Amino acid sequence: LFGDNDNNEYMEINEHVILVDESDQIVGTMEKMEAHVKGKLHRALSVFIFNSRGELLLQQRAPEKYHSGGKWTNTCCSHPRPGEDTFAAANRRLPEEMGLHCSLTFAFSFTYCKTVQKGIIEYEYDHVYFGTTDVLPSPNAAEAAAFRYLDLGTLEVDLENNPDHYTEWLKICFTQVKSSYRQYSNQLNLAR
């Protein structure tokens, strides 16, 4: 049901997530798969890495992922472990998933609830981080099957024309990513 029993995938499925309320206040923890089956609101993170040309690094989720396998999404998506904040989790997961290290900046947060496949509900309070690097990724094959760079205008058109190729959370937050990226890139230019 959840792919092969590769140790990385098995460990990920048996991890616990941080349950939160609508204000992102911790209300408990739950086994990751149980939280997704029951549709419990939990803390998550999404990392968006751009190159110096402003192109977004996308990953194609590995086909054996427990949901949304084969779909294109942002650079890195995950959950903090109990006792871990989202910034630390983002800095842990980016190299684990994509073999990248770079400075991350908090961009925004959003909440969404979507059934991503039969029996799996993503109900997340998602913390979004941006980073910039021209270093090419070295994806972990258990996490990402492929990667590509797209400018935000091209991605916007493809999201409209081929929505089934992309994860639900990317489609939901894309408009906010675009507006937040303008602010982020302006701040980067001012710092140079």
List PLM regions with ranges.
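A glycine-rich, hydrophobic loop/mini-helix early in the fold
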Residues: 44-76
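Acidic, metal-coordinating catalytic segment for phosphate/diphosphate chemistry
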Residues: 8-46, 52
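The catalytic Nudix box helix
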Residues: 57-58, 73-107, 129
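Nudix hydrolase/Nudix homology domain
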Residues: 2-3, 31-33, 70, 111-192
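N-terminal amphipathic/basic-hydrophobic helices that include classical n-h-c signal peptides
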Residues: 1-9
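Active-site segment of metal-dependent pyrophosphate-handling enzymes
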Residues: 39, 53, 63, 95-136
